[in-house]
Amino acid sequence: MSPRHLLVLGLLLAPLASAQAQDPAPKEYRVLLVGNSLTYTNNLPALLRAVGASQGTTITTETYAAPGGKLDDRVDEGHVSAALLARKFDAIVLQEQGGHLAACMASVQEQRKAPCAASVKAYGTLSGIASAQGAKVLLFGTWGPDDRWQGKLDRSVRMLAKKHESRVFDAAGALEALRKAQPDIKLYPDGTHPSTLASVMLALALYRDVTGIAPIAKDLRVTAPLLPVNAAVSPASAMESQTGLAGDGKTTVIPANLVEPLVKALPEPKDEDEDAEQRGSRGR
């Protein structure tokens, strides 16, 4: 082939090579979620799977949760540790009980109390096993009732992330960004638990944190029920295997036109130290 033909061929192939470099091949991700009603309300794991499917990326979830559950409860039961040792996960999401426990690291007095010590130990146990198995550890940063309390929650989860060499899944930050974009939206209908759209926002943000790729607004097809706050969730087995929670073949479609404003509202990823300095507190 002549040099001229080689040059023309190279020019034709260059855009294709560039597109391939920018568009990595979809991968399958396995995600382990541990938490309570903030995790299972509206079925965050199922929403995460739906976001993945909409992007051409298979996400498999395994979830251990219970109403009002604490991380040390899940450690004591042993199911989460056993799952980490038996199966390969790309990421684990740890969501602690809200209120004083989630914010306890921000207070020297609370740190000295047994519940806080047990929580910190549970974080360490699970993040240690997960990291040793090569999984990314994400600490679920929850939301509070006012600016002052939100500041405590933010400081606490970042202290834990630094202590255990983990990363923060800034759920509160994602929902605050949505509130700023849509001031009239009701994020917490009962004052605590996320609305359906709020949970979709969390799923979009979590997808980005797990995969490192920003989602594109597309129809979401959710193949498991959007669970209520009082769902009969048992921590004795993975939520995805429990009768009534795994789905009955029905699909809920969340159209792309509802997803698009949420994708646009996603906050830009920040360095965690920079984020902590710029955002000392957040309220609803």
Language-model-detected regions and their locations in the chain:
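Bacterial N-terminal signal peptides that target proteins for export
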Residues: 1-7
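Catalytic His-Asp segment of secreted/periplasmic serine-dependent ester chemistry enzymes
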Residues: 147-263
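Conserved SGNH/GDSL esterase-like catalytic core that processes O-acyl groups on lipids
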Residues: 28-32, 38-113, 117-118
